[in-house]
Amino acid sequence: MVLKWNRVLLASAILAALSVTACDAQPSATQKAAWDRNFYWGTATAGYQVEGDAPDSNWRRYVDRTAGKPVTPDSDPLGAGPVDPYKQAVDFRHRYHEDIANAHAMGVNTFRLGIEWARVMPEPGRWDERELAYYDDVLATLRKNGMTPMITLMHWVYPGWIADRGGFMNNVGAFEEFATAITKRYAGQGVLWVSINEPLAFGAMEVRTGAIKPDQFDAFLDRVADAHRAVYRAAHAADPDAKVTTNEAYISPEVLAQFVGLGVKGIEGSFFDRVEDSLDYLGFDYYTGTAEDNPASAQSMTARWNTKLQAEDIYHVARHYSQQYPGLPIYVVENGMVTDNGKPRSDRVTRSQYLEDTVFWLQRAKADGIPIIGYNYWSLVDNYEWGSYRPRFGLYTVDALGDPGLKRVPTDAVATYAQITRDGGTVPGYRPALPAAHCSTTVGKDSCEPLDPNGPLAELK
């Protein structure tokens, strides 16, 4: 029972955190030549979460095993209820032209997607040419629409045959074979590479699904670091100008303290410390933080729909990373706001308001010398959030369970994002709609001093 409880606490604590000195801000001439854009405005998806037609994988097996069955701590650490059937997700596999067109209409110039290892390599050593052609066409469609592809190579899903051989932890060599082939295939196309999505959360998901035990967490992160370095080597061998990162989901010290005491090792510091020598840019994800009036103890998974939002803390997190890892450009790979099945939040904050406030504070960060080069909104469309369609993050909302047509319905944030990408930020004179938290503790007490909303702002373009 102790082991099971520790597993639930570990997965819940990490996943709860996820749902919920100035320098020259201008890049040098050499840096400008190395990057295709002055600023990357993006939106994001992930293969398994949106594609449909799911091939055999660790996650398909988990969902097939648990969907629709009575809730247990192992099957529902997120507090979202029974595992939903996967069905066809939102069918990006057949509707990517529509989704890319919607992204293009908002003016975004970057599109994050995943290439699913399980889809393109369904058996050891066998490549599925039809599925590779599908990804070729997705990238060609992005290029026709003037977008930079950001490709994630591991977003927690791997082939069933890898699961049969001991899971990701024991098959980094096979992952390197996959990564080498994909980075070579798309070399020279201006791709921004993300090796492994949110390594800490990846470990939590492996615990959740029974692939690893809590006492294997530190060793698992070591293997993920090995995998990241393999991607870095492969991408740079194929293209010396390649740009590679891994995206860390920022978790506040207050939240980490809740489960460090469980005996789990490897989470005390940043994952970037393990791979600092193999990063071309630093990607992080931020959703919400902690404060004296928003303590971690109140941020349970069951309350996440109404957890206080702290848009201003994206500034503190960006500053923290710029100070810890000077010299690396910083990209917000994921940021967004969750709602409960699309219902209005109890605080009445809208997706548009949270987006505007977040961008406002990124403009402030840039003006204060923090080298922000890009921002992705998570997500373009509602998707399958690891066992549930209940959490909604999409700029376009989709009723995956109730609407056979999977209609994309724009939220209020679509028009807002179009204005932001056009103008390089919020409208002149905009001031944040959300009240700042009282004494933020998101990056420790150094973020307690409130930011002045009347400070300088930079255009992000």
Q: Across the structure, where does each feature detected by a protein language model lie?
A:
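Bacterial N-terminal signal peptides that target proteins for export
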Residues: 2-10
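C-terminal motif of bacterial Sec signal peptides marking the signal peptidase cleavage site
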Residues: 19-22
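Active-site region of glycoside hydrolase catalytic domains
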Residues: 28-73, 122-124, 133-346, 355-460
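Active-site mouth loops of central-metabolism enzymes
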Residues: 81-94
